[in-house]
């Protein structure tokens, strides 16, 4: 008689794929990290989870007829999946809605055309918004859904679980908008065509803490109240203002004992940051079937920023003209370098004195663009161009909506060389949570 070896937890996880998937799916990522440190035989659990349970195509299959084709369009247009959609991906939870940012102009037009070809129906008209060139809402109801007849976002309807989509055509680059738009730190997550980035994974997924960001408090007390009431507690986390200990650590005062200040370590302000650095949880997504884009990846992979505490914000005025206190918050700080003589927009941390790119400001490239445009023949100049600079030079040539002249010279090599000289000397990017 053959005796089967006894089955224990290690054996279930290592030898039986269905049991492995079932067990790991029930564990939060911080528990998986703890499990991987129990013994050598379980040290592979984290890597196994990343390989088997973070398949972006599975999450997108509910929204698009072909996830691969959507990701090809995403790569072509530099679109970014953001907000709660990206957070749900890191949580390994299914999502019923998807939020996408894409730069206005040809990229937004290409994405809109694809969505309509894929069967999405635009709800109502494009919504005007001060931060976007346009907000587009789409739905894709199933055949049995009673809401299929809904044609305007103001119509009465019952909530359903059919896919819905929000596309923001951004005035700035999609990346800069994705970093500025969130109201709370737990929402600082983005998904590109090839990678998923969580900028504050330790705070969000290990400590389970969420803090206010500038965008939640810089308008009015009423706006802050709306943010706090409408915020979905995806992680069952209360939203906190700035951690007082972090503020003391960042700005020591005479009231802060030196011994206490030395003991306090900020959980959010990690100093000069780069997308995909050791403080970022980076997941490389499968790219089988994806057409490698011809565009440079440096604007995203070399984007630098800093998340800084604002412990004493000034009071803000309510609708009745009364000053009200403002809770402390964090803000994402970066400078945008964009001009018609640059193919891409670059994000640079202005506080990083060791970054040679800080010595190159957007003004230089605006002036270069101005002189190049002035040297063009009248038929080659952008529409409505006048020498007094009435046409904006804050964006790339694509925002002009006309063909690039044959003689036009690009200066991206200069910026990219500066970025490489700053970051390539650092240690390799870790790209993992543990």
Show the residue positions of the predicted features:
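Catalytic cores of NTP-dependent nucleotidyl/adenyl transfer enzymes across multiple folds
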Residues: 18-19, 131-434
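Intrinsically disordered, low-complexity Ser/Thr- and acidic-rich regulatory segments
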Residues: 1-3, 433-434
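Ankyrin repeat (ANK) tandem alpha-helical domains that serve as protein-protein interaction scaffolds
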Residues: 30, 78-81, 210-216
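Active-site nucleotide-donor binding segment shared across nucleotidyl transfer reactions
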Residues: 35-43, 47, 57-112
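N-terminal Skp1-binding subsegment of the F-box domain
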Residues: 2-47
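Short glycine-enriched loop/turn motifs at secondary-structure junctions
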Residues: 4-7, 29, 92-96, 161-162
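Short secondary-structure junctions
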Residues: 78-79, 115-137, 234-239
């Amino acid at each position: 008689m053959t005796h089967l070896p006894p089955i224990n937890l290690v054996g279930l996880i290592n030898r039986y794929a269905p049991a492995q998937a079932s067990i790991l799916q029930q564990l939060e990522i911080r528990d998986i990290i703890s499990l991987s440190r129990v013994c050598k035989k379980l040290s592979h659990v984290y890597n196994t989870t990343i390989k088997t349970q973070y398949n972006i195509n599975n999450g997108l299959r509910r929204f698009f007829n072909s996830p691969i084709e959507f990701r090809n369009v995403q790569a072509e247009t530099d679109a970014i999946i953001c907000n709660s959609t990206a957070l749900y991906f890191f949580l390994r939870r299914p999502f019923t809605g998807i939020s996408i940012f894409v730069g206005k102009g040809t990229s937004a037009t290409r994405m809109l055309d694809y969505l309509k070809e894929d069967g999405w129906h635009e709800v109502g008209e494009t919504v005007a918004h001060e931060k976007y060139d346009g907000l587009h809402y789409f739905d894709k109801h199933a055949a049995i859904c009673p809401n299929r007849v809904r044609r305007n976002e103001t119509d009465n309807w019952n909530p359903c679980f059919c896919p819905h989509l929000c596309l923001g055509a951004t005035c700035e680059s999609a990346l800069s908008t994705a970093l500025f738009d969130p109201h709370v730190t737990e929402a600082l997550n983005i998904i590109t065509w090839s990678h998923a980035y969580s900028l504050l994974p330790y705070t969000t997924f290990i400590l389970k803490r969420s803090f206010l960001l500038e965008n939640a408090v810089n308008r009015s007390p009423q706006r802050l109240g709306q943010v706090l009431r409408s915020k979905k507690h995806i992680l069952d986390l209360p939203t906190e203002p700035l951690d007082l200990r972090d503020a003391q650590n960042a700005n020591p005062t005479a009231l802060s004992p030196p011994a206490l200040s030395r003991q306090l370590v900020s959980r959010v302000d990690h100093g000069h940051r780069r997308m995909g650095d050791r403080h970022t949880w980076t997941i490389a997504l499968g790219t089988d079937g994806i057409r490698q884009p011809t565009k440079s990846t440096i604007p995203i992979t070399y984007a630098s920023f800093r998340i800084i505490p604002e412990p004493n914000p000034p009071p803000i005025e309510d609708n009745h003209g009364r000053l009200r206190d403002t809770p402390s918050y964090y803000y994402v700080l970066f400078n945008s370098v964009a001009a018609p003589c640059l193919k891409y927009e670059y994000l640079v941390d202005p506080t990083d004195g060791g970054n040679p790119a800080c010595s190159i400001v957007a003004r230089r490239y605006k002036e270069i663009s101005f002189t190049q445009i002035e040297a063009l023949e009248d038929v080659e100049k952008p529409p409505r161009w006048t020498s007094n600079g009435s046409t904006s030079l804050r964006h790339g040539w694509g925002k002009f909506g006309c063909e690039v002249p044959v003689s036009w010279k690009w200066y991206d090599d200069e910026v990219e060389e500066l970025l490489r000289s700053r970051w390539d000397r650092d240690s390799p990017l870790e790209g993992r949570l543990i």
